[in-house]
Amino acid sequence: MFFVRCTLYLSVSMIKLQPNTFPPHIDKAAIQELPLTHFEGEVIVIDHPSQVAEAAQYLNQFTVLGVDTEARPSFKRGVHYPTALVQISTQERCYLFRLTHVGLPVEIAQILANPAICKVGLAFKDDINGLRRRRDFKPANCIDLQSIVCKYGIMDLGLQKIFAIIFGKKISKSQQLTNWENSHLTPEQARYASTDAWATLLIYLVLQQTKPLSKKQVEALKQAEKEAQYQRQQEALARKAQAANEQNS
């Protein structure tokens, strides 16, 4: 069993937000100026079947969990690797289940299928499908942040951007393309993986404390997004045409 102690903590109870004050977007340059944060709780790597029961017993105590997965990156078209890691986090502790070592344990599949426990992820359908290839189960009460953030005025869909919009802090994505099938996870990989699962949980908890926009407000925001996207496309076409004219003149 492998423990990692992190150095920062972001407590939902310490955050006071006014409802409907989130900006719809944040650009990459603005994110780079934000202070870096990461999960500072206990990280436990599960790489032997004997560790699973205790982890499942702990996780079953909670009604909301943050979930994320990782797979070995592929740099060839059409080549995909199976899910290598599933991270399940509370605010204080994150378990990293190494599926290359323990498969998808039945106890964890039962948590994912338990309607009494809310599981929160991002692009969650892809994660769930990957996990079901390890062991089939019927997912229940799984919430995808991408399907709900627009109700709070947030149009960006990436985890780093959503987190930055809500908390004004940056989470690192530097370990995303590392090899998750290595014999041992590095401390940097463990920190990255736990931070992603924890971040989804924290985002959900804050949104649950925030009054959503009305349906009319959401539709108006979506329409504004479509118009802005169309304007950007027209500007890009105009620049391309201008460049072609300059080349031909």
Model-derived regions: residue spans:
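N-terminal accessory regions of nucleic-acid-interacting proteins
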Residues: 10-65, 134, 145, 198, ...
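Conserved DEDDh/DEDDy metal-dependent 3′-5′ exonuclease domain
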Residues: 44-47, 60-64, 73-173, 177-192, ...
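Short conserved active-site loop signatures built around small residues
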Residues: 68
